[in-house]
Curated annotation (Swiss-Prot):
Keyword Zinc: yes
EC number assigned by the record: 6.1.1.3
Annotated localization: Cytoplasm
Species per Swiss-Prot/TrEMBL record: Treponema pallidum (strain Nichols)
Keyword entries, A-Z: Aminoacyl-tRNA synthetase, ATP-binding, Cytoplasm, Ligase, Metal-binding, Nucleotide-binding, Protein biosynthesis, RNA-binding, tRNA-binding, Zinc
Protein name: Threonine--tRNA ligase
Region (Catalytic): 193-488
Enzyme class: ligase
Gene Ontology BP terms: threonyl-tRNA aminoacylation
Catalytic activity: tRNA(Thr) + L-threonine + ATP = L-threonyl-tRNA(Thr) + AMP + diphosphate + H(+)
InterPro entries the record matches: aa-tRNA-synt_IIb (IPR002314), aa-tRNA-synth_II (IPR006195), aa-tRNA-synth_II/BPL/LPL (IPR045864), Anticodon-bd (IPR004154), Anticodon-bd_dom_sf (IPR036621), Thr-tRNA-ligase_IIa (IPR002320), Thr/Ala-tRNA-synth_IIc_edit (IPR018163), ThrRS_anticodon (IPR047246)
Main location: cytoplasm
Annotated gene: thrS
Amino acid sequence: MGLCVEENITMLQKRSDTLDRLRHSLAHVMAEAVQALFPGTKLAVGPPIDYGFYYDFSPPRPLCDADLAPIEEKMRAILRAGCPFVKEVVSRPDALARFKDEPFKQELIERISADDTLSLYHSGAFTDLCRGPHVQSMRDINPHAFKLTSIAGAYWRGNERGPQLTRIYGTAWESEEDLHTYLRMQDEAKRRDHRKLGPALGLFHLDEENPGQVFWHPEGWTLYVAIQQYLRRVMHEDGYAEVHTPFVMPQSLWERSGHWDKYRANMYLTEGEKRSFALKPMNCPGHVEIFKQKTRSYRDLPLRLSEFGSCTRNEPSGSLHGVMRVRGFVQDDAHIFCTEAQIASEVTRFCRLLARVYADFGFAQEQIRVKFSTRPEQRIGDDATWDRAERALAEACEAAGLSYEHAPGEGAFYGPKLEFALIDTLEREWQCGTIQVDYQLPSCERLNAEYVGEDNQRHMPVILHRTVIGSLERFIGILIEHYGGAFPPWLAPVQAVVIPVAPAFLEYAQHVARELCARSLRVQADVSAERMNAKIRTAQTQKVPYLLIVGERELRAQQVAVRPRTGPQHSMGLSAFSTFLLAKLETRALHA
């Protein structure tokens, strides 16, 4: 029996105070087990995370998946002792003495002020440097409700130039039932993995020699273009003017925009005629340059410029993930040039647009989560300007009736932002849309954008950076996993396959496909030498929404036997089927 995803996933929480304590405590138990089994192992850090925990080690030999089971057994043996978790507060010198043989702990301790105290947690004979909190006792941990899941590489403090560590991940829950539900979720996630489904469905492939770049095949590019055309139409209806800006722009522009100082490490650089250039990591400076090419009036505002902008970012190879984290991608990017008084109405308008688009792709209002991200430590602009930007966005949220989670310090370097995450079938969050308030980029200190106000004086516009789905590549990866490759008819690269029952009906199958294609439907005829049942299996494996079976009866009646992806088979005339399918596409129906 398959996993009933909707029923099971909603039972689980990613995080809670109780789960964090339990998982944090198990990270300590795992560290004790690893040091017992592999003497000489040095400890780094081990926090709780969504759905589980991890610990980073420097072991005396490489660890592999075969080591996970013995570590689990050792952890259960430690838990059977039932030791309490006991906190001890110590001075910095005392902590350094206690961890004299642990170089990573020593580095952490040395970063603490000499006058500060630190906390240690003891559990039996094991001691770790830790803020806590933990469960009171190992008896509070169900020894059958956790599992070690994987081993990966990691760098100390995330620095690629630092020591390489071994990271062991685990998942932990309050009950065995929750553990088993989570593991079934993970099995389902593996079946839906876009890195497997994408190539299997003929959508794309990835090349190890060219990491972070996607090769789109005909079916995948059909899906890509369908999404792009839909978004283009929606943006046009909402008052956006589409533009296109250069892929390569000079260092001087990136310096003035502030990207050169804040983002240069992630930019691809090139030189020509003794000048430095960069492949654009984002589109905003180009849109400002378009805005500046003529005198703008307050009557021109708000001005909404959109672009399917090709961007590149030099992401670390270890962070690349299928089509969801790549080095070359296209964004449904747009910038709204407006007055400060127009911020609230434009944010409200954008939120309506975003909800409409997400609904068409199959994400209801309750599957959208909003995060309000405020000023980060590394930023441009003064605090007074940031105060105005954050206040304006907060007022816009109130006007739009948005409830949101507050995320201090997670804003863009030039302004605060709202981030919109989609909750997929497996209850995972995917950050997609964003709208960001920017007083910095258009300022005279940066790109110097101006308009003439009602008072006939020059004023600086506010820029709202916004995207609905973000990277098209990433969004397609999300859709593949959300639908398991079984796309709604309007998105399916092939909407129907015509299958003849015997070679005698190949010509009619081709006729049916031609007629339906002429009505702007994506239909193919399978004229291969395979038997009918093999053709049906192939089409089902490719998750085609409709199979159209044709034989003697269908030829005589000029009909097709329609076999939808779900539901019974029935006969329809060609005109009736095309009308039926076109209605599905027009309404963007989610089911065949």
